[in-house]
Design a protein with these regions (language model features):
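Compositionally biased, intrinsically disordered linkers/stalks adjacent to structured regions
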Residues: 136-141, 263
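Surface-exposed beta-loop interaction hotspot
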Residues: 139-175
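Compositionally biased regions
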Residues: 4-7, 35-36
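Coil-to-alpha-helix initiation sites in intrinsically disordered, low-complexity, charged segments
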Residues: 5, 12, 222-226
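C-terminal segment of classical bacterial N-terminal signal peptides
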Residues: 28-37
């Protein structure tokens, strides 16, 4: 591998270093940028409730990779979301999130499982927001199972598993909204997410014409870590989310990585099934 006139010998050790580089960058970002952006939990403009929907996950060329299903059950001001994708190659991604919605959205717990050939590194992450306990189970480069468990001081705006919910309540006329997220690198690191509205775009559903608000969700990495990420091409890609506005906002589509270091995938509402 050649870079700027220097010759590097590509070895297994170098491969392991390159794989771990995104984790190092995020770790630096957490230290350098932990207090750079003020953040607060998103206010509840419309309460969540009972829901059962179907999704499709595709690559950007339109090939279907997985079928998805999302359910939502509310008990009082406590809501549980369960999102699952079943891939054609047998892989599974599941995210179960519980949160409260008394004036502001507050994460209570989040449990994510990703396994199968669609994921380079199988991983299971559990977050207990009340105690700050974060547990990550994963396999290292040699295939050995590892467990990391630590307490993290989680802010009220931690948003793991809540992105599709929060964007429906973000004010589209606010220049940007900042929330926090625990990134499993695999060591748990607290980072910031910027949610920036990009304006409205036309949306057609058959003969019906609507407008959807386009949001960009960006992982904020500043300082030296951000510069290194840019130079080395390791800057986390933006996630794009489209939300149907009005009195009953609804998720329409997203384009972004489903997991750290993953490819850009498109998630959108599935068409009606056949009876």
């Amino acid at each position: 591998m050649r870079s700027r006139g220097f010759l590097f010998q590509y070895t297994p050790m170098l491969e392991r270093i390159l794989f771990r580089l995104p984790a190092v960058l995020l770790a630096c970002a957490a230290l350098v940028h932990s207090n750079a952006l003020a953040a607060d939990a998103v206010e509840v403009r419309r309460t969540e409730g009972l829901m059962h929907g179907f999704l499709v996950l595709q690559n950007l060329q339109g090939k279907t990779l997985a079928d998805g299903e999302m359910t939502q059950v509310a008990r009082g001001d406590r809501v549980t979301d369960n999102l699952i994708f079943r891939f054609q190659d047998g892989s599974v991604y599941e995210d179960k999130t519980t949160f409260s919605q008394h004036r502001k959205f507050r994460l209570l717990s989040d449990h994510v499982v990703q396994r199968g050939p669609s994921f380079k590194h199988p991983m299971e992450t559990s977050i207990d927001a009340s105690s700050g306990q974060v547990t990550v189970r994963y396999k290292d480069d040699d295939g050995k199972e590892k467990v990391l468990s630590q307490r993290v001081e989680l802010p009220p705006d931690v948003s793991n598993g809540l992105l599709f919910t929060l964007v429906k309540d973000v004010q589209p006329n606010v220049p940007r909204t900042t929330v926090s997220m625990v990134a499993a690198t695999p060591k748990p690191r607290l980072i910031k997410l910027l949610i920036v509205p990009q304006g409205q775009e036309p949306l057609s559903i058959g003969k019906l014409q609507h407008k959807a608000t386009h949001y960009i969700v960006r992982a904020e990495i500043g300082g030296v870590a951000g510069l290194l990420a840019h130079l080395l091409g390791k800057q986390p890609p933006d996630t794009h989310v489209w939300v149907l506005g009005g009195e009953a906002p609804a998720f329409v589509k997203s384009e972004g990585p489903l997991y750290q270091g993953g490819p850009i995938w498109r998630i959108q509402l599935a068409g009606a099934g056949q009876f």
